[in-house]
Design a protein with these regions (language model features):
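Membrane-interface interhelical linkers
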Residues: 59-64, 252-255
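Short, hydrophobic transmembrane alpha-helix segments
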Residues: 23-37, 56-62, 88
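Active-site pocket-lining segment
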Residues: 114
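Polytopic alpha-helical membrane-helix bundles and their juxtamembrane interface segments
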Residues: 69-72
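Alpha-helical transmembrane segments of multi-pass inner-membrane proteins
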Residues: 6-23, 41-54, 74-107, 117-266
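Short, Lys/Arg-rich, polar N-terminal cytosolic tail immediately upstream
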Residues: 1-4
């Protein structure tokens, strides 16, 4: 009974955490930024309290095993701390928030270690939020809904197109991964297809070059993980080495040209 109750609490807190893009408490002036940040911090605080209490009362499950991926958040935090301009100290609150997000990463890793069943649920809920955001943005582009910025037509539930495009960019590879996992057409398949289709339609209108690059790189990586046979690829590379070299050179030229075009896009 205690385990079921704890699972329910984790499910509720995770659902509230993933609902952060739509959070609005109606009490803070800069509600589109501050309220979302405060919402994440509040839910993360409750999540850490529940997780620490669970480890204290039931230490048998232990801490989650570390992988090479777990080094990345700490590495990113270290890089940010080293490159931060302490002389002018422009945004100390962002340093605090980034540190909190690193702690949240390890909290979620511990939650998934204790209850792996939540991975599927949280993934599907995350994709659903991406689908809602994409539909929201499409309605704004068509003039059926107001944006949150007078200078931009497309913002979703965010303040400007930058974070909105970034949010869509992180939902796309997750949706693609779940889509490639499905052996039959079921609810996760159609939900992932809907998220990918609507996000691809809306994302170019955000004019976010970093989001476009992130989508291409991350989706290519996800596709390679699920569909690329390394041994077969190595065999083909040895058999058609010349053509792969030519293709690599042409691809590099196209990449440089595309990068230059993206750089000058907003000038």
């Amino acid at each position: 009974m205690k385990e079921l109750l704890k699972l329910g609490v984790y499910t509720l807190l995770g659902t509230l955490l993933l609902s952060a893009p739509f959070a609005g408490l109606g009490m803070l002036s800069t509600h589109l930024v501050t309220e979302k940040t405060f919402w994440i911090q509040l839910i993360a605080l409750f999540l850490s309290a529940v997780s620490l209490q669970g480890l204290w009362l039931n230490p048998s499950k232990g801490l989650c095993p570390w992988t090479y991926v777990d080094i990345l958040p700490l590495s990113l935090l270290g890089l940010i701390l080293l490159s931060y301009p302490y002389s002018i100290h422009p945004e100390p609150e962002k340093l605090l928030f980034i540190g909190q997000m690193v702690v949240l990463w390890y909290l979620l890793r511990q939650v998934f270690h204790e209850y792996p069943v939540l991975i599927g649920y949280f993934s599907m809920f995350f994709i659903a939020t991406g689908l809602i955001e994409a539909i929201w943005g499409f309605r704004q582009l068509q003039g059926w809904a107001y944006s949150n910025h007078s200078l931009f037509r497309l913002t979703g539930s965010f303040f400007n197109p930058g974070p909105y495009s970034g949010y869509l960019a992180i939902t796309l590879p997750v949706a693609l991964g779940i889509l490639l996992e499905q052996s039959k057409r079921n609810m996760p398949y159609y939900l992932s297809m809907g998220c990918i289709g609507t996000a691809i339609v809306v994302l170019p209108a955000g004019m976010s070059r970093s989001a476009w690059i992130a989508v291409v790189v991350s989706c290519a990586w996800v596709y390679a993980l699920y569909r690329l046979d390394r041994k077969q690829a190595a065999t083909r590379l040895r058999q058609h080495k010349r053509w792969y070299i030519i293709g690599g050179i042409l691809g590099g030229i196209l990449l440089l040209g595309g990068s230059a075009s993206l750089y000058t896009l907003k000038k």
